[in-house]
């Protein structure tokens, strides 16, 4: 068994135009990530919907840092309810590959700058706490302060809320993670109604989280920039009395 199947990652993301890391993930350039921080959820959704990516958004989160915008490259991991024989095979793979610590550490240990941990935990909160303060601190250090999205819970909320990371989770519980097995790192995961692939650009806002395929990331930021420029021009012309709000809101004439 191979928890992190590099070849499979490359096959699943073969339409990405970008370089890849050692795990096969597409690496959307830092410049695009920086520009993505100014994109609204609605702007990103509009581009994705136009390309028939209709199930890339998930809402209804407990957002520990609503004043922060989360942007980064997805590192995915998937848990399943614990079954003894599967659990034993996974831990044998971990020993064979020198993985240190508990299974909740393994995906965190792969994180690099500007990565976002995306955890499929089938909505489990009690005993589904993907991180606490120690792992949250490790995420902050390894990523430079991005964060995580977990379809499950976290613990140590009072301490985690003080870390310089964004956290989107389903809830908080004092228990430790238990009764689950990590079966895959950097494979497809289901987060609510969305399918996420490793290397997707994660955009988390007060609205929710949207997952942008790498091949569409540049189009998303360019469309957003055009929208902001149009909005700025329209507001300026309205304030100057040149155009009315009705003229600005409709399709623009050649003169405009």
Show which residues each predicted segment covers.
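A structural signal for short secondary-structure junctions
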Residues: 196, 203-204
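A short, compositionally biased micro-patch
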Residues: 153, 204-205
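Feature captures the catalytic cores and cofactor-binding loops of soluble hydro-lyases/lyases
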Residues: 30, 34-198, 212-256
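Buried hydrophobic positions in well-ordered alpha/beta secondary-structure cores of metabolic enzymes
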Residues: 24, 140, 200-202
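Short glycine- and Lys/Arg-enriched binding-loop motifs that mark or flank ligand-binding interfaces
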Residues: 20, 148, 204
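Channel- or pocket-lining gating/hinge segments that regulate access to a cavity or pore
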Residues: 207-210
């Amino acid at each position: 068994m191979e928890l992190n199947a590099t070849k499979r990652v490359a096959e699943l993301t073969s339409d990405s135009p970008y370089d890849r890391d050692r795990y096969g993930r597409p690496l959307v350039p830092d410049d695009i990530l920086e520009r993505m921080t100014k994109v609204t959820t609605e702007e990103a959704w509009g581009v994705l919907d136009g390309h028939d990516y209709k199930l890339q958004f998930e809402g209804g989160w407990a957002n520990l840092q609503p004043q922060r915008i989360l942007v980064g490259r997805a590192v995915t991991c998937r848990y399943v309810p614990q079954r003894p024989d599967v659990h034993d095979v996974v831990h044998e793979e971990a020993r064979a590959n020198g993985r240190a610590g508990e299974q909740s550490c393994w995906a965190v240990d792969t994180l690099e700058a500007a990565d976002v941990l995306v955890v499929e935990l089938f909505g489990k909160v009690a005993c589904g706490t993907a991180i606490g303060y120690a792992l949250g601190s490790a995420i902050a250090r390894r990523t430079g302060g991005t964060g995580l999205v977990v379809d499950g819970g976290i613990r140590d909320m009072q301490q985690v809320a003080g870390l310089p990371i964004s956290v989107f989770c389903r809830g908080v519980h004092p228990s430790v993670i238990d009764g689950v097995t990590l079966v895959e790192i950097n494979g497809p995961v289901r987060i609510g109604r969305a399918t996420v692939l490793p290397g997707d650009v994660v955009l988390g806002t007060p609205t929710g989280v949207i997952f942008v395929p790498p091949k569409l990331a540049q189009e998303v930021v360019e469309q957003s920039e055009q929208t902001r420029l149009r909005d700025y021009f329209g507001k300026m012309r309205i304030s100057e009395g040149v155009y009315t709000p009705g003229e600005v809101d409709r399709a623009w004439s050649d003169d405009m």
